[in-house]
Curated annotation (Swiss-Prot):
Subunit (UniProt): Homodimer. Can form tetramers and higher multimers, probably resulting from the dynamic association of dimers.
Reaction(s) this enzyme catalyzes, per UniProt: L-asparagine + H2O = L-aspartate + NH4(+)
Molecular-function GO terms, alphabetical: asparaginase activity
Name of the protein described by the UniProt record: L-asparaginase
EC number, UniProt record: 3.5.1.1
GO process annotations (BP): asparagine metabolic process
Residues binding substrate, per UniProt: 52-53, 84-85
pH-dependence annotation: Optimum pH is 8.0. Retains about 40% activity at pH 5.5.
Keywords assigned: Hydrolase, Secreted
Thermal dependence: Optimum temperature is 37 degrees Celsius. Shows maximal activity between 30 and 40 degrees Celsius.
CDD domains the record matches: L-asparaginase_II
Consequence of gene loss (knockout): Not essential. The growth of the knockout mutant is impaired, although not fully abolished, when asparagine is provided as sole nitrogen donor. Nitrogen assimilation from asparagine into glutamate and glutamine is fully abrogated in the knockout mutant at acidic pH. Mutant is impaired in host tissue colonization.
Signal peptide positions on this chain: none
Organism field: Mycobacterium tuberculosis (strain ATCC 25618 / H37Rv)
Amino acid sequence: MARLTVITTGGTISTTAGPDGVLRPTHCGATLIAGLDMDSDIEVVDLMALDSSKLTPADWDRIGAAVQEAFRGGADGVVITHGTDTLEETALWLDLTYAGSRPVVLTGAMLSADAPGADGPANLRDALAVAADPAARDLGVLVSFGGRVLQPLGLHKVANPDLCGFAGESLGFTSGGVRLTRTKTRPYLGDLGAAVAPRVDIVAVYPGSDAVAMDACVAAGARAVVLEALGSGNAGAAVIEGVRRHCRDGSDPVVIAVSTRVAGARVGAGYGPGHDLVEAGAVMVPRLPPSQARVLLMAALAANSPVADVIDRWG
C-alpha cells in the first residue's frame, strides 16, 4: 500500500459559496479525501487555504518545503491541491527545482466543491492514483486534471465546457486506470529559492504601446522583462526601441524575452517586427506562455545559468 501525502493550498477544489454567493476556501484536506475509497495510506497537510491569485513566489518555496518534509516522513508520493489560476506557475517552479525520484502531482478543480457535478473529487482521486503508480517514479512533477496527466512545461489554463482545465503536453490518461504513454522532460535548474529570485515582470504589447511600462519595470529592479507580444512575437517601433535601450545601450543590460498573447501559438522572428526585436537584443521564447516564461527566467537568473541556453533548451 502506497503512503501518500496530500498538501492542500486552497483553490476552487476547496471552495463553497457563502451566504453572499462568493466562493471561498472552506474544505480542509480531510474533507476533500473523505469518501474517495483509495487503496493508499493518506496523510493530509493543510498548508494554506488561499485563492491561488493570492500566492507569491515565497509560497512556492513553502509548498516545495512541505513536499520535502513529506518525503522525509516516508511518503511514496505527494499530491498538491491548488487553485487553477496560477497552477501553471507553481507546477513549473516545482519542476525546475525538484530533482527527486518520487512523484509530485498537482491537481485542482474548475467547479466549487458544492457545485452540481463538482470535478474536484474525481481529479483528486486520479491524482492520488498517479502518485501511487510505480510508472510515475522518476518523472518528477506532474499535473493530473480532467482525466489526463500533463507535463508542467508549456501548461496553460483554458476555458472549456468539458472541464479539462488546461492545455499542454499530455503524458497519459487516468480513465480506467493510470496509463502513462509518453516520456517527460525534467527541466531541473537547481535547489533554488523563489522568494529571493531576481525580479521578472510581464509587459503587455498592444496597438500603440510604448516603452513606458518596460522602463518602469526596469526602474523597479527587474532583471528581466517578458513581453506579451502580438501574434508570433511582434511589437511596434516604440517597444522595439525600448528593447534596444535596455539590451544593447545600457551599462547594465536587462533580459527581454518575447512570448505571445495568443494561447498555444509558437513564437519566432519570421515577421519584420519579430526580427527587429531579436536584432534589438530580445530573445524569443518559442513555446511557453508569458506566465511560464517569467518563471523560467526567474529560475535561470537565480541559478546564474545562461538565459539564452535555458530558453533554447526548455523555452
